[in-house]
Amino acid sequence: MSENIAFIVHLPGKPEHRDELESSLLEVLEQMAKEPDFVNTYLHRSVEDPDTLVLYETWACSPAYFQTHHLSRPYRQVYEQALPRLLKRERTLEFLKPLRAFEKPAA
């Protein structure tokens, strides 16, 4: 698969589950990084709402393939089942169309 996708995920956590949400997500990210079509991910915490985690992900696959293949991986099952308890509202997933990358030149 030669198509690259990027997307942003917002995970608005419940304050009482902030640490559990983060640790559960980190376990998934460790496994996710081993996937052959994984490119990168950046995990952030919202400044405006510290209970919200935000991911920026890039994959070498189509959005449809990502949603049907990666969201159902066995290492995600416990995490996916826990999300309704950990989140104050449903997560959002916004797909982006990569246009161009800008990187700092090597010194």
Residue spans for each PLM region:
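An amphipathic, aromatic/His-enriched active-site/gating alpha helix that lines ligand/cofactor pockets
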Residues: 27, 33-39, 58-94
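Short, well-ordered beta-strand segments in beta-rich or mixed alpha/beta enzyme
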Residues: 5-12, 40-70
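Glycine-rich beta-strand-turn "strand-cap" elements at beta-sheet edges
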Residues: 1-5, 42-51, 80-107
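Short, flexible segments with low predicted structural confidence
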Residues: 3-5, 20, 37-38
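Short, surface-exposed ligand-recognition loops at beta-strand->loop->(often short) alpha-helix junctions
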Residues: 12-21
